[in-house]
A protein has these predicted regions:
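Elongated alpha-helical scaffolds
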Residues: 95-99, 242-250, 616
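Alpha-helical transmembrane segments and their membrane-interface boundaries
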Residues: 1-120, 125-162, 332-490, 498-517, ...
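Long, hydrophobic alpha-helical segments that serve as membrane-spanning/inserting helices
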Residues: 1-19, 30, 34, 55-56, ...
Length: 708
C-alpha cells in the first residue's frame, strides 16, 4: 500500500505529465551535449514541443495509429517546407493549400484537428531552422526524432497507467458537478435580490463547462470500450459516468420558481437547509473526484442522514403553520430529488449496484467517430462552403500565414518566420478568443525578452543554458492551459536560449518582439475583417437549435411517461443534445459581451433569453428526473397536449400568435380542473407543465425580437 503522501504524487497526473516533459527535454539537451553538437538541441526540442502539443488520449492501438498519422503528417509538412523554400511563389501556393487542407481535416474530428495543428506548427518550426542544415532531409528527420522520443515516453506512461486520462476526465466531471451544485445552492439564498439574474447566468455558464467536460469524458470512454466492455474496471468507469449524467439531470432540474420560493420562505430556515444540503452534495462530489484521482474508496458523509431528518422536521413545521399546499408539494418534490442524488452518491461504490444487469441499449454510448468512407465524405462536404465556420477559419488562416510570408519576402526579415508562428497560435476561430490571446501573447513576449536578456548575460555557460532550456520548457507546458501569458513568457525564454546556442541570443531578442507585434496585428485584422465570426449574428440560429433540442428532450421524456422509465440510448442522446445546445447558447451570449458591434439592447435580450432557456431546460429536466410510467388517461392526454403546445408555441408563425395563446390558456385551465392522485408523480407533472407554460410568453416575445 502506498502512503497518502506518496499516493498523492504517484497518481497526480499533472506531476506525471510534467515529469514526462522533463525527461523528454533532458534527452533532447543531454544527447547533443554528449555528442558535442549543441545545434542538435534546437530541432530535437522543437520536435518534442510539437509532439507534446498534439498528444491525444486513446487506447494503445489508437495511440499507435495516431503516432503513425502524426509522424507522416509532420514529415510531409517539414519536407515540403525544405523542398519548396527556394521558390517563393511555389512556397506561397503550398502554404495556402496545405493550411486550408490541414484545417479542413479537423472536420473529421478532434483527433485530426489536433494533428493538423501540429503539422502546421512543425512546418513553421522548419522555416525557423531552414538554414541550419545543408541537406533538405536533415532537419525534418531531427524534428521527427524529437517527436518519436516524446511519443516513446508517452507510450511507456500509457502502459504503466492505461486508464489514467479517463480517470482524470471522470474526476474533472465530478469537480465541475460540484461547482455546479455550489452555484445552484446560491439560488436558495433568501437575501438574494429578486431582480438579480447574475446567479442564473453564472449557473448557465457553469452548465456549459460541465457539459463540455462530460462530453470529453464520454469521448475518452468510447476509445476504451471497444472490445473491453466486460472488464471490471470498464464497468466501474461506465457506472461512474452514468451516475454523473443522472446527477447532472437532477441537479439541473427546477421544481419551483425561485423568486416565489424566496418570497414565501424568506424568514424560514427551510431555505438555508436546502442551501446547506446542496452545498454538502457539492462537497461530496469534490470528495468523490479526489477519490477517483487517488484511486481510494469514496466514503459518503454520515451527516447527510441528519441533515435530511432536520429538513423533514422543518418542512413539517412550515406545513403546520398553514403554508400553501402547492408550495409544500413543490418542496416535497425538490426534497425527493435531493434524496435521489444522495442515494446515487451513497451507493456509487457498491459492487451490487455496479453489477446490476442492464439492457444492452442502457449501456451503449453514442459514438460520434468516423464510420466508413461515406461518413468521411459527408463530414468534409459539410465544411466546403462559407456557411461553415471551419471553412471560414481555414481560408482566414491561410490568408494570415500568406500575408506574414509576403511581409517577410518584401522586407527581408532574417527571423521573420516568428510572425507566422505568432499568428498560428493567436488567430482563433472567433474574435473574442483571438482578442484574449493577442493581449496575453504580447505581454508574455515582452516579459520573456525583458527577463531573457539578463539571463543570457548571467548564464553564459553551455551547460547552464541547456539546464534553463529544460526548466523553461517544463514551465511552458505547466502553464499553457492555466495561464497563457506565463506560458508565452517561458516559451520566449526557451527560444532565446535555443538560438543563443548558435550565438544569436541577443540578436533575436528585438526581432522576437517586433515579429510578435506584427503577427498579432495580422491576426487581429483577419478576425475583424475576413469573414468575422461575430457571435451576435449566430444568435438566431443557435437559439433555434436550443429550442429544437428542448422540444426533442420533451418528446423523449413523454415516451417514458407512457412506456416506463429506462436509460436507453435515444433518451440519453436527447438529454445530452438539450444540454449541449444550452451550453452553446451560453457560449454565444458570453462572447457577445465583448464584441464591438453589439448594442446594449441586443446584449440584454440575449442575456435574458439565455436565462429563460436554461430555466426551461431545468423545468424539463425535472420531468426527466422523476419520469415513470403513468396510467391515468387524463394526465397522459394533458401531457401529450402540453408537449405539442410547447413545440407549437416555440415554432409558430407571427400570424398564429392568437391561436397559440388561446391553446396555452386552455391548457392552464385544464391543469386547474384536474385532480391528480397524490401518491403518484401526477402532481409533479402538472406542476412542471404549469412552470413551462409560464415561461413561454416571454420566450416567444424575445425570440421574435431576435429573429426580426
Amino acid at each position: 500500500m502506498l502512503s497518502p503522501l506518496l499516493r498523492r504524487y504517484t497518481w497526480n497526473s499533472t506531476w506525471l505529465y510534467n515529469a514526462r516533459i522533463f525527461i523528454a527535454l533532458v534527452g533532447t539537451t543531454a544527447l547533443p551535449w554528449w555528442l558535442g553538437d549543441a545545434k542538435l538541441t534546437i530541432p530535437l526540442t522543437l520536435g518534442v514541443v510539437a509532439a507534446a502539443l498534439t498528444d491525444l488520449d486513446d487506447r494503445l492501438t489508437g495511440r499507435l495509429r495516431n503516432l503513425v498519422i502524426t509522424l507522416f503528417s509532420f514529415f510531409i509538412a517539414s519536407a515540403s517546407v525544405e523542398l519548396l523554400f527556394p521558390w517563393p511563389w511555389l512556397f506561397a501556393l503550398g502554404l495556402t493549400v496545405s493550411t486550408i487542407s490541414f484545417i479542413l481535416l479537423g472536420g473529421l474530428g478532434q483527433r485530426y484537428a489536433t494533428i493538423a495543428f501540429g503539422a502546421l506548427l512543425i512546418a513553421i518550426y522548419t522555416m525557423l531552422g531552414v538554414s541550419l542544415y545543408a541537406h533538405w532531409y536533415q532537419q525534418p528527420l531531427l524534428l521527427i526524432a524529437g517527436a518519436v522520443w516524446y511519443n516513446l515516453l508517452t507510450l511507456t506512461g500509457h502502459l504503466i497507467f492505461p486508464i489514467r486520462p479517463l480517470q482524470d476526465n471522470l474526476a474533472r466531471s465530478y469537480e465541475q458537478l460540484a461547482h455546479y451544485l455550489e452555484l445552484k445552492s446560491r439560488l436558495f439564498d433568501p437575501d438574494l435580490d429578486d431582480e438579480n439574474q447574475a446567479p442564473l447566468y453564472e449557473l448557465a455558464l457553469a452548465n456549459g463547462q460541465l457539459v463540455a467536460t462530460l462530453n470529453q469524458t464520454k469521448a475518452s470512454l468510447l476509445t476504451r470500450l471497444r472490445g473491453d466492455r466486460g472488464q471490471r474496471s470498464t464497468r466501474r468507469t461506465l457506472h461512474y459516468y452514468f451516475v454523473a449524467q443522472d446527477i447532472h439531470e437532477r441537479a439541473s432540474s427546477s421544481h419551483i420558481q425561485y423568486q416565489a420560493l424566496r418570497d414565501h420562505f424568506r424568514y424560514s430556515d427551510v431555505m438555508f437547509r436546502f442551501q446547506r444540503l446542496l452545498s454538502m452534495q457539492s462537497l461530496a462530489c469534490q470528495a468523490l473526484s479526489r477519490a477517483i484521482l487517488l484511486r481510494t474508496p469514496y466514503q459518503h458523509d454520515a451527516r447527510f442522514e441528519r441533515a435530511f431528518t432536520h429538513l423533514d422536521a422543518a418542512l413539517d413545521r412550515v406545513r403546520a403553520s398553514g403554508a400553501a399546499p402547492e408550495q409544500m408539494k413543490a418542496l416535497g418534490f425538490l426534497l425527493n430529488n435531493l434524496r435521489a442524488i444522495d442515494a446515487q452518491l451513497a451507493t456509487i461504490e457498491s459492487e451490487q449496484v455496479q453489477s446490476q444487469a442492464k439492457s444492452e441499449t442502457e449501456n451503449l454510448l453514442a459514438d460520434d467517430s468516423i464510420h466508413g468512407f461515406d461518413d468521411i465524405r459527408s463530414r468534409l462536404s459539410r465544411n466546403m462552403s462559407p456557411e461553415s465556420a471551419l471553412f471560414r477559419h481555414a481560408v482566414r488562416m491561410s490568408l494570415v500565414l500568406c500575408a506574414g510570408y509576403a511581409f517577410i519576402q518584401l522586407t527581408g526579415l532574417q527571423h521573420g518566420y516568428w510572425i507566422l508562428l505568432t499568428s498560428l497560435f493567436v488567430c482563433q476561430p472567433n474574435y473574442n478568443a483571438t482578442r484574449h490571446r493577442l493581449a496575453l501573447r504580447i505581454i508574455g513576449t515582452l516579459v520573456g525578452v525583458a527577463l531573457g536578456l539578463p539571463i543570457l548575460w548571467l548564464v553564459p555557460s553551455l551547460e547552464g543554458q541547456l539546464m534553463l532550456i529544460v526548466i523553461t520548457g517544463v514551465l511552458f507546458f505547466a502553464f499553457r492551459n492555466v495561464q497563457y501569458a506565463h506560458a508565452t513568457m517561458f516559451i520566449t525564454l526557451l527560444v532565446l536560449l535555443c538560438f543563443n546556442l548558435l550565438g544569436e541570443g541577443f540578436e533575436v531578442a528585438l526581432p522576437r518582439v517586433i515579429d510578435t507585434l506584427i503577427g498579432c496585428g495580422i491576426a487581429w485584422i483577419a478576425v475583424s475583417f475576413i469573414w468575422p465570426d461575430w457571435k451576435f449574428r449566430n444568435l438566431p440560429r443557435v437559439l433555434e437549435r436550443a429550442v429544437n433540442a428542448n422540444c426533442r428532450y420533451l418528446d423523449a421524456i413523454l415516451e417514458q411517461y407512457h412506456q416506463g422509465r429506462d436509460n436507453r440510448l435515444a433518451y440519453r442522446i436527447a438529454r445530452r443534445d438539450a444540454h449541449n445546445r444550452d451550453a452553446e447558447l451560453a457560449s454565444v451570449v458570453s462572447n457577445m459581451s465583448t464584441e464591438p458591434n453589439v448594442t446594449a439592447e441586443m446584449r440584454e435580450t440575449a442575456f435574458r433569453l439565455l436565462c429563460l432557456n436554461h430555466t426551461l431546460t431545468s423545468y424539463i429536466s425535472a420531468l426527466g428526473a422523476h419520469r415513470e410510467k403513468l396510467t391515468t388517461p387524463e394526465i397522459l392526454a394533458l401531457l401529450d397536449d402540453a408537449v405539442c403546445y410547447v413545440d407549437d408555441a416555440l415554432h409558430h408563425l407571427p400570424s398564429d400568435e392568437d391561436r397559440v395563446s388561446q391553446a396555452l390558456n386552455g391548457l392552464s385551465a385544464r391543469i386547474n380542473h384536474l385532480e391528480p392522485r397524490q401518491d403518484s408523480k401526477e402532481p409533479l407533472v402538472l406542476q412542471q407543465i404549469g412552470l413551462m407554460i409560464s415561461l413561454l410568453p416571454e420566450i416567444c416575445r424575445l425570440q421574435k425580437q431576435v429573429l426580426s
